[in-house]
Amino acid sequence: MSYKSHQLIKDHDVKWVDLRFTDTKGKQQHVTMPARDALDDEFFEAGKMFDGSSIAGWKGIEASDMILMPDDSTAVLDPFTEEPTLILVCDIIEPSTMQGYERDPRNIAKRAEEYLKSTGIGDTVFVGPEPEFFIFDEVKFKSDISGSMFKIFSEQASWNTDADIESGNKGHRPGVKGGYFPVPPVDHDHEIRTAMCNALEEMGLVVEVHHHEVATAGQNEIGVKFNTLVAKADEVQTLKYCVHNVADAYGKTVTFMPKPLYGDNGSGMHVHMSISKDGKNTFAGEGYAGLSETALYFIGGIIKHGKALNGFTNPSTNSYKRLVPGFEAPVMLAYSARNRSASIRIPYVSSPKARRIEARFPDPAANPYLAFAALLMAGLDGIQNKIHPGDAADKNLYDLPPEEAKEIPQVCGSLKEALEELDKGRAFLTKGGVFTDEFIDAYIELKSEEEIKVRTFVHPLEYDLYYSV
């Protein structure tokens, strides 16, 4: 059999193969092996054994053996290694059955795609996420029994207008909420973003746009072309890898955490979605904003299950510091054409082929495999049960009087609430065995540990508020 990997190894004299997978929390992991061992066809049938008990939320030590099964279609050269290295994304396989591990996020995403086909609603779901991030010059933080702190260093930050800078303070920097999107020199990050885009293109992603985002201190976005669900989740992990490593090469540091700065915009990951059947966009129609009834029902499913979705789309305590009014983060579970204060937006498009919906509440802390799969399952449940989203909200939802605002459902206010909603509202996720109860239980337990740790940790602001009581 002919393998793409074998050709790349031979053509580029590849010395090492890097096997990658994503854990439950969304962090990409890897193990590296000599390229000569990947030239055997058996490698793509038998995979590589590893210890699953070392991955949080997976196996116990008494049954820890698992298999990394490489996906040859994902083979790509790593532009950051000194020695020629080939990257292969892997699925996690259960050795006893040689089937996909039910807690492997990539396998969950694959099952979601298969479930879509089984419903007859469509054969392909297209996903286009927009993960935002911050580029800092340096960051320091600590949290232990002696105290806690964090400090961000950013030459372009608005708070550095009077700072002593070795190369001189040139004064050109975006203010709070002023980063969208002046030309250089106010945009300090143009060159590094371009380098990031070059690396992304080298790794096979199709860059559509890059720009500075709203917040000061280096908030940025790189827009990449949409793809099918699993492929796009793979690409999100590639994007994070590229962005982190280019920043490191420039002597800078990147974070995808949703709200690193108090008082300025946080980073979202708006997710564009549409479903195709027999090559036709099922979301295009003659209804509101050019949507079909199918698309409206899809929106209805996301709105109905919005709070449960938060457990996967906004999976950190920090996520809920972003989801507050006043910083362009949507907190109202409503939909509208072009209205960015609604949690579901219908972007303007010139062609029905591009008709889609945009979920605006997710953030880049999310595991992309789990978030995209969960959004799809919510939308499909809406279609199957004909859940209409009601009237569109074409006014600024941030300015609604209290009596109107209370009639509109909102996203969760905390990770604790999101996990509780996920626990009690999970039925739409377990259809077709896409998400299993065992996985959801393990996920909730894993994320609850984070929530409890943050909730019980002594916060520096508490000293400011209460030290002198």
UniProtKB/Swiss-Prot annotation:
It is an enzyme of class 6 (ligase). Binds 2 Mg(2+) ions per subunit. The lineage of its organism: Bacteria, Pseudomonadati, Pseudomonadota, Gammaproteobacteria, Pseudomonadales. This is Glutamine synthetase. It is found in: Cytoplasm. Belongs to the glutamine synthetase family. The gene is glnA. NCBIfam families: GlnA (TIGR00653), PRK09469.1 (NF007006). Residues 105-469 form the GS catalytic domain. Oligomer of 12 subunits arranged in the form of two hexameric ring. L-glutamate binds at N265, G266, R322, E328, R340, R360. One of its GO terms (molecular function) is ATP binding. The modification O-AMP-tyrosine is found at Y398. Its cofactor is Mg(2+). It comes from the Bacteria. Catalyzes the ATP-dependent biosynthesis of glutamine from glutamate and ammonia. GO terms for biological process: glutamine biosynthetic process; nitrogen utilization. Its EC number is 6.3.1.2. Mg(2+) 2 binds at E132, E213, E221. It comes from Pseudomonas aeruginosa (strain ATCC 15692 / DSM 22644 / CIP 104116 / JCM 14847 / LMG 12228 / 1C / PRS 101 / PAO1).
